[in-house]
Amino acid sequence: LTKSTSCRILAESGTSLVKRRDVKPTAKLLWAAAANGYHQGAAGFGLHDMVRSQELTFLKDMYDVLRPLGSPELLAGVDKIYHVRDQPRSKITFGSGVPGVRPVLPQSLEEGKPQRIPLRIADDLQHMNSLGRVKVVKLRLRLVNLEPSRNQLKIELNDKTLPDDLLNITDLNYRFVKEGVAYQGSQIYEYRLAPDFYPKPGRNWVKVTLLNKDPDVDITFQIGDLDCSIEYRLHRHFERHPIKY
């Protein structure tokens, strides 16, 4: 739209998350949103409802959180959570942020029918890893109503099947938090990605295939959440809390 013109595009984000633990986004979620905006050509990034947002989870550290939003260079090495947009419990908030634009999630899983979900990130993880800066990269899916021991899944990232030795499953069936029951009936499939499986800058694709479904269960399985979590070291060979005794 702005090619060969003097116009610039400014990206913006709201501060409504409406998840089970946090109504407002955390710093890592905002940093990821801003990084994606810059990566797609935005000249600046802002929060469009900052004035009336009095319950932000980062108010106590506001300067440290807001400062990186002004520059893609400052954002390059900060921790991020790239969360695929979903439909919040309150549908009037429009999970995409734009009325009329359908959120990507949730998606239903049917046996033998793959679901492809776009996941956009801005980080050049291979470059940062060559500098020794990458601490951990995790791909996380929250699956609803699915019992891992009774159902077989195949999960791929950019056409590479993620092996089970990278997988850790967390059962949320009976998990309570101060806000109440946390995602009852859900399982978190978390892959701690090796460098060969790192997502690339730009659009990536996560494909989830239900290979075999428990024949004794007549209930819809869903992909409820999908995110990529990235943590960095301040510099090579640096750990924040290395002394254990």
Locations of regions flagged by a protein language model:
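Amphipathic protein-protein interaction modules
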Residues: 139-141
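Structural beta-strand segments of beta-rich domains
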Residues: 135-137
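Acidic, serine/threonine- and proline-rich intrinsically disordered appendage/tail regions
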Residues: 238-245
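Glycan-processing catalytic domains of CAZymes
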Residues: 1-116, 121-131, 146-151, 155-158, ...
